[in-house]
Amino acid sequence: MKAEFDKELIKKYDRPGPRYTSYPPATEFTEEVKEDEYVKRLIKSNERKTPLSLYFHIPFCEQRCLYCGCNVIISHRKGIEEPYLERVCREMDLVSQYLDKDRKVIQLHWGGGTPNYLSPEQIKWFMEEIRKRFEFGDNAEISIELDPRYLTDEQIKAIKDAGFNRISLGVQDLDPKVQQAVNRVQPYELIKEKMEKLREAGFESINLDLIYGLPYQTKESFEKTVEKVIELNPDRIATYSFAYIPQVKPHQQLLPKEALPSAEEKLRIFEMVINKFQEAGYVYIGMDHFAKPEDELAVAQRKGELWRNFQGYTTKKGVELLGFGATSIGMLYDSYFQNWKTLRDYNKTVDEGKIPVFRGYVLNEDDFIRREVIMDIMCNLGVEFSKIENMFGINFREYFAKELEELKEMEEDGLIKVEEDRIKIMPVGRLLIRNVAMVFDAHLRRKKELNFSRTI
């Protein structure tokens, strides 16, 4: 894929916007939607008999990475995690009592923070506690995020014994200057060694996370990182655009702002990334993922079954996601719920015997329609009008008359093509896919101030 950008086009489309891991985005959640609504929606979800996906947030980290946009607790003092895990078990009890026992878990993810902040014993114990409360389906996808700097041989064994079958390693960039600037020093040799040990342990699916747009990155420097990553031969690669939002994440103010690549340079970097990974045999998935052709993600994209949730792209469209732990987000078919963000609030609520939800959102009919359109854009690189019309009983061109008018400019700029029965994302538009999705975002139209990362 070769995409040419002129400076005017970059200037025109480089604006803040959501990443659409949900629609509406989490910025629309309201504190009026709390525990009682969650309980009601959990009970109602049993009628759908949908399988479950579980997310567990392990918020602890040994040190802060300056690019990080996650909700983390920095602590060198081990022991802080024990009472937290016990409370997460209590939260599971509070939630699982409302769920039919025959609903199988087909996907589980531990994120953070740093899940391998936990000791080998804690990893095994905590997974046993989860299995006591939930029934797992055959061939469930069980994944964990790992920080290679702190990963021990004992942890690798414990993770394998606990039943994990997918690994995600945070690499970000292999350039020493960039690593120092973002406070995450991890030499290539270390990543290579951990990858080899994970392969020896029998893990068949390993994902590497990269970030472009970090201080001191150039197309030339990041090309070296990409070449080394290709040598490591991961099954999947996620290449995220750095979300620089110092107004939301104050620690990002410690990054040298003058060393951040321009929007133009970021696009040069990502064009190189796309070309390099495709030349190496990876399939370009959605907005920012790459996978081997036989990988489930690539198969799902070919079948039009890709979906997005708060962990990014997923092959499990028809599942309902339950989030456990501080700050985690659950996604039922018709509603979203988020737990308290601070440990103090989370602990206090669980200790009172309440589900620790502090805000959420219940979708209306317009939200359902727009979510399907936006997810099709983000996942399937286009929208078929007839599909949306059949699902919701609307006339697409009438319902979205204003949006189709707005899209004419994007069509002139070569981002999309509006055909008889569909909107098709063109190669250039793929790099600006969030901008295309934003046209269909009814909530964004009402927003004055945008606390989102920039689209480029």
Swiss-Prot record:
Iron-sulfur found in the keyword field: yes
Biological process per Gene Ontology, one example term: porphyrin-containing compound biosynthetic process
One MF annotation (Gene Ontology) recorded for this entry: 4 iron, 4 sulfur cluster binding
Enzyme type, top EC level: oxidoreductase
Cofactor section: [4Fe-4S] cluster
Localization (cell): Cytoplasm
Stored CDD domains: Radical_SAM (cd01335)
Catalytic activity as recorded in UniProt: coproporphyrinogen III + 2 S-adenosyl-L-methionine = protoporphyrinogen IX + 2 5'-deoxyadenosine + 2 L-methionine + 2 CO2
Classification via Gene3D superfamilies: 1.10.10.920, tm_1862 like domain (3.80.30.20)
Protein family according to the UniProt entry: Belongs to the anaerobic coproporphyrinogen-III oxidase family.
Protein name in the entry: Oxygen-independent coproporphyrinogen III oxidase
